[in-house]
């Protein structure tokens, strides 16, 4: 990916982070193609946007927002996906429902209405 392309991705992510008060960071690695497709279909039905992102680009985008997202920097390791939704609990419900049949996705962290949550155990907040 060229530098211009990376800058465009960072700008787009920064816009999404700025314009959404709710987003979840999850690990969907180790899902096979069938499960990944099922997860994406479920996200589409529930009006949740799911995007796989590079950690370095996501961190740069986070730094460009006026939100306090520093607590989320440490979770940006390994495979990362970001989920955006209007309703603060929509991604959490989706993750819980999907995990009835699969071990993933695993919640890494979330930003909901100016509150930061870290770790999979926060799924029931």
Model-assigned labels for residue ranges:
Residues 117-125:
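Phosphate-binding/catalytic loops
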Residues 1-111, 115:
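Positively charged, polar, low-complexity stretches
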């Amino acid at each position: 990916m060229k530098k211009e392309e990376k800058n465009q991705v960072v700008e787009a992510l920064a816009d999404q982070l700025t314009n959404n008060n709710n987003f979840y960071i999850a690990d969907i690695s180790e899902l096979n193609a069938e499960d990944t497709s099922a997860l994406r279909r479920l996200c589409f039905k529930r009006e949740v946007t799911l995007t796989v992102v590079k950690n370095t680009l996501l961190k740069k985008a986070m730094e460009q927002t006026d939100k306090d997202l520093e607590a989320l920097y440490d979770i940006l390791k390994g495979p990362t996906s970001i989920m955006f939704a209007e309703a603060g609990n929509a991604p959490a419900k989706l993750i819980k429902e999907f995990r009835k049949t699969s071990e993933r996705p695993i919640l890494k962290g979330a930003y909901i209405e100016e509150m930061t949550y870290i770790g999979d155990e926060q799924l029931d907040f």
